[in-house]
Amino acid sequence: MRQLYYTLQTLIRGKGSNLIKIISLGLGLAVSILIFSRQAFELNYDTCYKDHERLCLVKTVWYYNNEYHPSHITLGPVAGTIAENLPDEVESVTVTQQWWSNSAWFANERRFQTNAMTADSCFFATMGIDVVSGDPRELNNPEVVFISRELAGSMFADKNPIGQTVVYNKQMPMTVKGIFEDFPENSSFYGSGVVMSLATSFKHHWGYWGWGGGDSYMSFVRLRPGVQLDDVNTRIEKLAEQVRKSDDVFISLVPIKDYRMEFGISTMRMVWILLTLGTAILFIVAMNYVLISISAMNRRAKAIGVHKCSGANTGTIFGMFLWETGVIMLFSLLLVALLLFNFREPLEDMLDVSLAGLFSWENIWAPLSVIVILFMIGGMLPGQLFARIPVTQVFRRYTEGKKGWKRPLLFVQFAGTSFIFGLLGLVLMQSHYITNKERGFDYHRVAYASGVSFDSDAESDANRSVMLSLPYVEDGACSSNLLTDGLSGEGVTTDNGQWMSIRWVEFGKDYAPFMKLEFAEGKNMDAPGQILVNETFLKMMHWEDKPIGRQVRNGDRIAGNIVGVLKDFATSNAAYVAVQPMYATYLDRFSGNIQLRLKEPF
């Protein structure tokens, strides 16, 4: 305790330099802790499920245009076929559709916003999510939903939700048959509060189910204990060839924890860039603390000599500096806590995770590691130097004539600062490129409502007229999908009989000009049986020469005749996915995703 007493006395006398140390360490710790904790959280994604080591996602790789195109979206029957043919290796499988992000649900005339999905009765058992109440087998019936515990509390408070009615988009009533535990923040399903039955999708034809197209499903497979993933993938590859009878699609399983990295939602490259940035910041902060501490050597040399004359040994002096570093870091951590508390909302918005999730028990090792490393560098380096000051220093006049030790530290600081600013500039340039990349259509000032349907053409036309007559609406149109969300999966048959996976969407008659899609040739659709294609579609089909009038088909099913060719535009996330071949068919009713372009100012 005597060491701590002398340490506190020293800190009180040097309060000016200590304030600089606290602010410097506080800011550096805050940034470093946030960077390292966020990357630890990223690497911990989708490990929240029970026995996640046995949980896999079905990966489909399509081969066309002499290129391989991996996707986490697959054909509907894939999971069931795997389960039927590999019963000794597979414990359970499930199929979902992830189309209803930020959808509107109504209970007792109150509106709730949440992500929704469809799933079969094996979903919760396969994913390892606890069911609070209800029988998952109810998901075999149409118009049935399971809701999360949090959403159930918001909708029905203390009432029993089982048997209650919720209405999707004020149009489709469904019955609550169960409650499940909320998805954790490190789940890719986080924010999904509603699980609709897959039977509802079948009833309302929300996607094609078959081997001939409609790759619109996410499928998950839970392996039995002790089963090797590589062995299963070898058998699945042969199975896919037998079922599909073609070599244009490859199916395999990937661990659920690799989902985000495997399919470009996140990348190890960005993780390493941010880890490098965090390491550089941490190193510069530590060196800055060491430099400030050592610069006080001329003031503190005599005091250290006095301590040694009083019986303090090298270990005692070293311990005093460790105490000093610990106290300063304690105040710095209080500053960090103050900053995090006051800037909580913008930080959570930038990090895309709550601070509670960021500093959960699974990730607490990351901030603790930052603190320990900084303590070791900041405490041990100056502590060793000061502990070596001889006792005779009390009888000498200390001069700061030799300043060579400062130059290496200053060089490291300036070099590190230059590196940090250079790396930040690179990240900002990449971010600017991604966020401002030309997508080939105009989405500015466009508001939308999803899942809209009407019972008749007259009702549809009446609602369209009302919407377009609003004083703040400039124009309006509709489509089956939002271009910013990606398009549905579909298949086409080439002239030589080969089946290929492409993207498909329905456009209302005014949608192409509404989104300012440019035509390479031909005209817009104005009747059923007409379709639009993009330039990549023509390259895939080798139809660059005179495409107008050609017939597009999927096996024996005819999609329509080409009347126009659109210039290529982003069909998915332009930052990660190249332009995909697509065609658009005619949507004859004002429904689906209704989009309105608003007048300025809003």
Name every feature range the model reports, one short phrase each.
Residues 35-102, 203, 212-222, 230-235, ...:
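Membrane-proximal extracellular/periplasmic loop immediately following the first transmembrane helix
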Residues 34, 240-241, 325-389, 429:
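Small-residue-rich transmembrane alpha-helices
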Residues 43-52, 191-205, 261, 338-365, ...:
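Short juxtamembrane loops and helix-capping segments at transmembrane helix boundaries
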Residues 1-4, 9-17, 49, 235-280, ...:
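Membrane-helix entry/capping segments
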Residues 5-16, 20, 285-328, 388-399:
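Intracellular coupling helices
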Residues 6, 13-43, 406-430, 441:
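Short, strongly hydrophobic transmembrane alpha-helices
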Residues 17-31, 271-291, 324-336, 363-371, ...:
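Alpha-helical transmembrane segments of integral membrane proteins
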Residues 120-133, 145-266, 465-602:
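Mid-to-C-terminal secondary-structure elements
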